[in-house]
Structures are given as structure tokens and as C-alpha cells.
Amino acid sequence: MVIILDTSKQISEFLRQQYSVRASHARELAAAFLGFKSHAAYLALSAGQKWSLDSIDVLIPDLECLEQRLLNISNLPPLANYRQLAQDIGDDLRLQKVFSGPVLIAKDLTELESVLDSSYLQENITLEDELSGEIAISNSWFGYEYYDTVKFEAGRSGVKVHATGVFDGEHDGESDRPNHGDKIDFEVDLELKLMAWGVGFRQTIAVSGELRSPY
């Protein structure tokens, strides 16, 4: 099981190797990435409050905290800006297989809303699997999804996204099976539930759909 303490160490090692950041500064930046004002604040957590990355699906680094630490720490070597630095850290966590989920780069709710758009839904939801029952009775091939609306709601416990769209297909004209429809109206409910401090989230996805009659 990978614990957050190992994650902090992994981030610190990456910063030291990639940017030649001194150890004490690397620990402060790692803590900021994970949502802490300081490394001491991170260490103050009891063991029961430290989360395993196995229980987290999505990371949203604390960009504001990281930006402030970069401004407040003296004698840092040349570094990427806080956004790129967060992206580089996230890429390394994935490369080292410390974390395998999405790392979303968003400083506030407005930016997060733009990230959790139809492109994110398309990358993280396979409609062929989610709507397999409707597809099975349609006698059609499906492969084109169009999102009509994407609505975003944020609260203390996390964020929710509700989307609607059409999964478009084509009836197999060479088949002697009847055409029961080649369009599925679908709805998606995605929730990112806050699990660890302000950066770790559990993702749940629910998809429903109804085959549109061709008649």
C-alpha cells in the first residue's frame, strides 16, 4: 500500500533530481502540492489522517498553495511556473506508478469547470460499455458521442457534473435483423468526492440511456 508520506518523499526526490532543489525546500513544495501550508503542517497529521493513494482516483493539486510557497521560499533555483511545476510533479507520480489516475490542473472552481468538460467525460467514460444493454437490442453499430449540456456543481464535499447527449450509431443495413434505433439519448452523472485534504478525490460515474425509436 502506498501511503501519502511516500508520495511526499517521491515528490521531494523528483524536485531535487529534476531542478536541484535543496532537500528542505523540496519538502515544503511537496507539502504545498498536497494541500499543506508547510511540511510541518503535513507532519502534524496523525497516522489515521494519512490517506493511501489506492483510495484516491483523481488528484487536483493545490495550485494556490504551491504558488505561495514558490513566492515565499528564498534562494530557489530556476523553476517552472507553479502550473507547469504541478503538471511535472503529476506526470512523475504517474511515471513512477505512485498514482495512476488523472491529475487535474485547476486553480479555482471556474478553471475546474472548464477542465471537467465533455472532453474529460469522453476520456474517462466508455459509452460502449456503459450502454451495452441498449446497444445489444438496437442492431446498430455505435461510435459517435455528442454532449449537448454539461452542468457543474461544487460544494464542500466535492464537485458534481451532470451531462446529457446523444450516442450516434448506424444500423447494419446488410443484416436481416430489424432496426430498433441508431441513437441513444444518455445522461451522465460524475462526482468527485473529497477524500484527502483538498487534493484527493474519489470518482464515481453513473450512466443511463434510452434507445430512440426510429419510427
Question: Could you describe each region identified by the protein language model?
Answer:
Residues 1-90:
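C-terminal alpha-helical interaction appendages
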Residues 60-215:
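Cystatin/cathelin-like cysteine-protease inhibitor module
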